[in-house]
């Protein structure tokens, strides 16, 4: 009996594999419609900091590291030594 089962294969693994593939495809399809999270975060952070300090956008680095339990957002902004501040109009 064991030899026949070995030759026929395990029928239970096919539905499990199909379900996993469907989950993976659904996840991938869901990600396509979303904007690039890291790009959006970079632009929004740049806009906020630019209101107060003159900076070079090419000197801003944003990294997102995803872990199993925690994700880390690292923002590296190079600010000039003279710290040229912008004047913010008060309404």
UniProtKB/Swiss-Prot annotation:
**One GO cellular component term:** plasma membrane
Entries under SUPFAM superfamilies matching the protein: Cell division protein MinE topological specificity domain (SSF55229)
Q: Does the keyword Cell inner membrane apply?
A: no
> Taxonomically, which superkingdom?
Bacteria
Biological process (GO) annotations? division septum site selection; regulation of division septum assembly
**Keywords of the record:** Cell cycle, Cell division
**Record's family?**
Belongs to the MinE family.
The role this protein plays is:
Prevents the cell division inhibition by proteins MinC and MinD at internal division sites while permitting inhibition at polar sites. This ensures cell division at the proper site by restricting the formation of a division septum at the midpoint of the long axis of the cell.
Supply the name of the protein.
Cell division topological specificity factor
Source organism: Bradyrhizobium diazoefficiens (strain JCM 10833 / BCRC 13528 / IAM 13628 / NBRC 14792 / USDA 110)
Gene that encodes it: minE
